[in-house]
């Protein structure tokens, strides 16, 4: 009885001590006061991350705003800018460690003047162990892309070790369920037990099973397979795969294709770039981004998103621009395109594309967006293609390369001739839950009108 009373008092003391201590700080009798640095949630969809290069080593001082470590999230390679002051005492997760759950300890921070040698033997278990991977966010939360504080994660319970092995064994390493006689016979006949399916009680391999396997004709030698290389899947690639698979299965796509004459647009682009004196260099994509915004203001139903119970129609046009990076595709956003001029759009796209390729995008650079554009026009082999909608958006425009097309014209004297016209083929993908076929066609008509009369983009 006395032991139970003392135990309850001790537990109460521990609870009070934990309640008084900051959430990131743990105090241990055998170590000086210290703070446990945990894996942060750098995007709303992030549940785990890979550890990149540490920018600080044990003993280095850290000031607010300095980069502590590079972290590969489900979106991009990002810098973890630390917001506290102190000295790095111990690294718990080394460069290259993968799938570290949000909330798991990754390092130890102490105040300046603390002897960091006291932490030489400090382990992950001393910091509370790895956190359990948090559950995936609800779809509505993903759609809103709101950044919320990450709740403190609880440590995952250690698996109970068995007395026979001391640890849980992988299924492939377990001894097959086999009788002693069958095991002996298999050894004599050189029959691999792992390849057999037992017919005895509970799936046990019997002598008869071994005899049948030994008497069976040898399988023809398999032809040597083609050489291959297994490439590890990054968190970003996993996220791309998951989101696009969900988009195809949950968003009923329909497609509208049109040929657009860009002869006037190319002449206007050349004239503007010639007079810019190096201040800017407009691309065809810059004009198309602006044209998307104009079409969306004229047909606002396309600039919308499917939400639970409502269709949300946006007042501003935020265009997500697909950018290919060494680690995968990402879509940084040009916000408020309807209010921006071509020069500003061009500068913004160039800045975002550079940050994307350098892995320097912030969450606010790619979270959100109301409509997307994917342009493969720089590849002369791509005449046209269709793109998958970037959820929760309702539309994406796929742009092919520019080609010269012979078009018939009627001369003033009544004769007919041929002129060469620069054209591109564009295909818009629409979410039929949000956009009806007639609405998608109307949007494409407005886009065609403004692209083929590009002076309207300057209004």
From Swiss-Prot:
UniProt cross-references to Gene3D superfamilies, sorted A to Z: 2.40.50.100, Chloramphenicol acetyltransferase-like domain, E3-binding domain
Transit peptide residue numbers: 1-28
Site residues (May form a delocalized pi-electron network with Arg-384 of 2 other E2 subunits within the complex, which greatly improves protein stability), renumbered to this chain: 384
Domain Lipoyl-binding residues, every copy: 34-110
Domain of life: Eukaryota
Subunit structure: Eukaryotic pyruvate dehydrogenase (PDH) complexes are organized as a core consisting of the oligomeric dihydrolipoamide acetyl-transferase (E2), around which are arranged multiple copies of pyruvate dehydrogenase (E1), dihydrolipoamide dehydrogenase (E3) and protein X (E3BP) bound by non-covalent bonds. The Chaetomium thermophilum PDH complex contains 60 E2 units, 12 E3BP units, about 20 E1 units, and 12 or more E3 units. The units are organized in 1 E2 60-mer, 4 E3BP trimers, about 20 E1 tetramers, and a maximum of 12 E3 dimers.
Function: The 10-megadalton pyruvate dehydrogenase complex contains multiple copies of three enzymatic components: pyruvate dehydrogenase (E1), dihydrolipoamide acetyltransferase (E2) and lipoamide dehydrogenase (E3) and catalyzes the overall oxidative decarboxylation of pyruvate to form acetyl-CoA and CO(2). Within the complex, pyruvate and thiamine pyrophosphate (TPP or vitamin B1) are bound by pyruvate dehydrogenase E1 subunits alpha and beta and pyruvate is decarboxylated leading to the 2-carbon hydrohyethyl bound to TPP.
Cofactor(s) needed: (R)-lipoate
Any single Gene Ontology cellular-component annotation: mitochondrion
Family: Belongs to the 2-oxoacid dehydrogenase family.
Organism of derivation: Chaetomium thermophilum (strain DSM 1495 / CBS 144.50 / IMI 039719) (Thermochaetoides thermophila)
Keywords: Acyltransferase, Lipoyl, Mitochondrion, Pyruvate, Transferase, Transit peptide
Region Disordered, annotated ranges: 129-174
Disulfide bond entries: none
One Pfam family here: E3_binding
Domain Peripheral subunit-binding (PSBD) residue range list: 177-214
Reactions catalysed, as given in the entry: N(6)-[(R)-dihydrolipoyl]-L-lysyl-[protein] + acetyl-CoA = N(6)-[(R)-S(8)-acetyldihydrolipoyl]-L-lysyl-[protein] + CoA
Family annotation (PANTHER family): DIHYDROLIPOAMIDE ACETYL/SUCCINYL-TRANSFERASE-RELATED, DIHYDROLIPOYLLYSINE-RESIDUE ACETYLTRANSFERASE COMPONENT OF PYRUVATE DEHYDROGENASE COMPLEX, MITOCHONDRIAL-RELATED
Protein name (record): Dihydrolipoyllysine-residue acetyltransferase component of pyruvate dehydrogenase complex, mitochondrial
InterPro entries: 2-oxoA_DH_lipoyl-BS, 2-oxoacid_DH_actylTfrase, Biotin_lipoyl, CAT-like_dom_sf, E2/Pdx1, E3-bd_dom_sf, LAT1, PSBD
Chain positions found as N6-lipoyllysine: 75
């Amino acid at each position: 009885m006395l032991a139970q009373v003392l135990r309850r008092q001790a537990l109460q003391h521990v609870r009070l001590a934990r309640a008084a201590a900051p959430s990131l700080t743990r105090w241990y009798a055998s170590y000086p006061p210290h703070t446990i640095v945990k894996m942060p949630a750098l995007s709303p969809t992030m549940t785990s991350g890979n550890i990149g290069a540490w920018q600080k080593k044990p003993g280095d001082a850290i000031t607010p705003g300095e980069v502590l470590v590079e972290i590969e999230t489900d979106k991009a390679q990002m810098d973890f800018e630390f917001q506290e002051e102190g000295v790095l005492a111990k690294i718990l997760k080394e460069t290259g460690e993968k799938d570290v759950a949000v909330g798991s300890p990754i390092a130890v921070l102490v105040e300046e003047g603390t002897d960091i040698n006291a932490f030489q033997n400090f382990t992950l278990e001393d910091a509370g162990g790895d956190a359990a991977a948090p559950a995936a966010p609800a779809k509505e939360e993903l759609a809103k892309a709101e950044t919320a504080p990450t709740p403190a994660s609880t440590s995952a319970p250690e698996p109970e070790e068995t007395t026979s092995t001391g640890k849980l064994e992988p299924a492939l390493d377990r001894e097959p369920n086999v009788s002693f006689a069958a095991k002996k016979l298999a050894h004599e006949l050189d029959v691999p037990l792992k390849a057999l399916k037992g017919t005895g009680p509970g799936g046990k391999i019997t002598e008869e099973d071994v005899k049948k396997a030994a008497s069976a004709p040898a399988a023809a030698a398999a032809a040597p397979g083609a050489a291959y290389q297994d490439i590890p899947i990054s968190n970003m690639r996993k996220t791309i795969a998951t989101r696009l698979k969900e988009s195809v299965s949950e968003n009923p796509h329909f497609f509208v294709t049109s040929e657009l004459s860009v002869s006037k647009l190319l002449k206007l682009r050349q004239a503007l770039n010639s007079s810019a004196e190096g201040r800017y260099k407009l691309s065809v994509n810059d004009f198309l981004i602006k044209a998307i915004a104009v079409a969306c203001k004229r047909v606002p139903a396309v600039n919308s998103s499917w939400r639970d119970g409502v269709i949300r129609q946006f007042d501003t046009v935020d265009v997500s621009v697909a950018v290919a990076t060494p680690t995968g595709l990402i879509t940084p956003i040009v916000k408020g395109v309807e209010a921006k001029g071509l020069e500003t759009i061009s500068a913004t796209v160039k800045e975002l594309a550079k940050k994307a390729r350098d892995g320097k995008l912030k969450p606010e650079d790619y979270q959100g967006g109301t409509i997307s554009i994917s342009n493969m026009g720089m590849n002369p082999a791509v005449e046209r293609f269709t793109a998958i909608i970037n959820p929760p958006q309702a539309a994406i425009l796929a742009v092919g390369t520019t080609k010269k097309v012979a078009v018939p014209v009627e001369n003033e004297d009544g004769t007919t001739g041929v002129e060469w016209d620069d054209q591109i083929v564009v295909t818009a993908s629409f979410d039929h839950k949000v956009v009806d076929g007639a609405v998608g066609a109307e949007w494409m008509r407005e886009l065609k009108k403004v692209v083929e009369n590009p002076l309207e983009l300057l209004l």
